[in-house]
Amino acid sequence: DRLGQKSWELAESELQKTAIDLALRKGGLHRRDLDLILAGDLLNQCIGSFLASMHANVPYLGQYGACSTMAQGLALGGCLVESGAADRLLAAASSHFCSAERQYRFPLAYGGQRTPTAQWTATAAGAAVLGAEGASDVCLTHVLFGKMVELGVKDANNMGAAMAPAACDTL
């Protein structure tokens, strides 16, 4: 689960780098073809995304929206492309179960029992290229930014219950 890396955080960065490279390859593009990278993860200072993007020689804007990071990157990216602020950019997000456990809950070596309401973070990464012109039939037509809705959920492990009211209000 470390993809040959020394830590889970570096493994997460490698996952995101792989997703970025795959999205560019599928689009027949190189990093130099991008005006901006919008990328995020669940780590402090978005270190996984920073490490995945640091050698791209492309402006980078770290995104931190927890579960909404990819949607946030796509929405912001779509607005930047539509406004003419960027011609082509890439949105990416990643997470790693083990690094999230260490940062948000309990380190795995601690051996603590999970609460029944605790969420399970995916070990995954995704990336998408957005541009005003391209060969894809897939496009963003609208974006909707939600607002925070606080109903006083006290269970710190039940992130789903904390996020659900805002999702319901938005949708």
Residue ranges and their predicted role:
Residues D1-L38, L42-S49, H55, V149-L151, ...:
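Conserved active-site "lid/cap" helical segment
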Residues L10-E12, P59-A71, A118-W120:
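Active-site nucleophile and cofactor-binding loops and adjacent substrate-binding regions
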Residues S49-P59, V81-E82, Y104-Q113:
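A glycine- and small-aliphatic-rich helix-loop capping segment at beta-alpha/alpha-beta transitions
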Residues D1-E9, P107-D169:
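Condensing-enzyme catalytic core mediating Claisen C-C bond formation in acyl metabolism
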Residues R31-D35, A56-V58, S83-R88, P116, ...:
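Short coil/turn connectors at secondary-structure junctions
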Residues Y64-A91, L130, P165:
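Active-site-proximal alpha-helical scaffold in enzymes
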